Amino acid sequence: MAEREEEGKLYLRMYHDVCMEHVSAALERVVDAAEIPLRRVSEEESGRPALPGGWSRKQVLGHLIDSASNNHQRFVRAALADALEFPAYDTPGSVRVQAVASAAWPMLVDLWASYNRYLVHVIRRLPAAKLEVVCRIGSNAPVSLGYLAEDYVRHLVHHLDRIGVATRS
């Protein structure tokens, strides 16, 4: 019985190493691929809507910084708990309250890139035993901590693609 338990722990560690290394490496590639194109955007261009009727690049990047901040807390708190509930996320309210549209574009790019590089570090070190911790965010269906990390990268790529920033190097 103890031997099977050890085999299970070994499998979980191997799964974690592959899964979280894949997620963190994907995030790192996205940041590396997107940072230079983001830095090439002028202050003026960053304030214009990327798509007709949509948010400006500043607002999108501000949202992604806020997403990094929210998910950082989710990753760390879930890794310290057996289950966790988080409040719903008010995207438009958050962008408005933080006055992202009046922030300097280079500062936003610096913060976005640095915060996401730190999240690469955090994701790589999430404990294997905590990847299945159940997380509830607002009224959404419960998901695992591992899923949150994977979905964070998908969300980031989606928004960068929407503002015309290539995420593949």
Description of each model-found segment:
Residues A26-R39, S94-E132:
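Acidic/histidine-rich alpha-helical segments that form the ligand environment
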Residues Y15-C19, S56, V97-A104, N140-S144:
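Short amphipathic alpha-helical segments at helix-loop
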Residues R40-R48:
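Cytochrome P450 catalytic-domain "roof"
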Residues A2-R13, G47-T91, R117-A128, E132-S169:
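Short, contiguous alpha-helical
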Residues M1-R29:
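Terminal targeting/low-complexity segments that flank the catalytic cores of oxidoreductases
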Residues E21, A25-E28, K58, G62, ...:
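A generic "alpha-helical surface" signal
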